[in-house]
Amino acid sequence: MPLTLSRWLPGLLLTAALPSLAHAEGPEYGPELQGFEYPYTVKHFAFESQGQSLQMGYMDVAAEGKTNGRTVVLMHGKNFCGATWDTSIKALSEAGYRVIAPDQIGFCTSSKPEHYQYTFQQLATNTQQLLKALGIQKATLLGHSTGGMLATRYALQYPEQVEQLAMVNPIGLEDWKALGVPYRTVDQWNERELKVTAQGIRDYERTTYYDGRWKPEYDRWVDMYAGLAKGPGKVLVAWNSALIYDMIFTQPVYYEFKNLKMPTLLLIGTSDTTAIGKDIAPPEVKAKIGHYDVLGKQVAKLIPHSTLVEFPGMGHAPHMEEPAKFHQALLAWLNKTNPVR
């Protein structure tokens, strides 16, 4: 059922009246992140999906210098965009890879539909259509956070097109609902997302992503997310975010890790404590979820051809926290592991 924008106006007016929930902090960006500068040129892929015309923003960055003829596709996380891969794009390009970094539907520079049936299968299909249009038949996937769940689904759906699979602190290494996390409805998620602020994002990420640490360079990414959430498209941004959270919570990939056939790399910051719904979970449930120091080892045993690289003391985004150390480990594995041809 299409979203009726007027339905949400009372909530928006209420939000505007509560300065503790929404305040004029930082920049505002358009509904497709207009006004935010990406590290490379953003192109747009137009396609039809679920009876509507949509577009995906993406970066297509050629190898610098001598190319190795291979392509890496980057899949961003829930609170991230293609732009947050900036240091990874540079490192991979300098190493001879062509790099494709799309923004998925509902995110960042891509369409925010009024109605969309979000599934990881659908997002994988959209991405595969983009790669086909770009003439890419095989690629290595690198997924971060929610992008790890999407990369897993893509690898299961199109195994013949995936040479290698690498995941950076993917969420979905456990099934939160099976472990007792309560269900939050789409409407409840939407109400929560309408109240997003830069300070709220910063506090959450400092605690959950970075183990209490913060670097000034992270503020750019907070402003990106918060600026989109409070900009002129905030109603549709929040609604799509709510639908995406429901997809993440209800569509686990955990039970299918055993079916992955390609070489797989898990890059895990061990101090990460991310778990969807943790904020509303009972204390006894909260205590047992989101332990990446344990989850990485457990899931590595489930994936047939896996390699685990841990970054002790790092959090949810080691590629942003310590780029040099992260990319050294990533490139070493990519270069020594024979891709599926």
Predicted regions and their residues:
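Conserved HGGG/HGGXW glycine-rich cap/lid loop of the alpha/beta-hydrolase fold
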Residues: 50, 54, 59-109, 329
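Flexible "cap/lid" loop of the alpha/beta hydrolase fold
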Residues: 152, 156, 165-196
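Conserved alpha/beta-hydrolase catalytic His-Asp/Glu region
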Residues: 196-258
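Conserved serine/cysteine hydrolase catalytic core
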Residues: 230-301
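Catalytic active-site module of serine/aspartate enzymes centered on a nucleophile-bearing elbow/loop
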Residues: 293-341
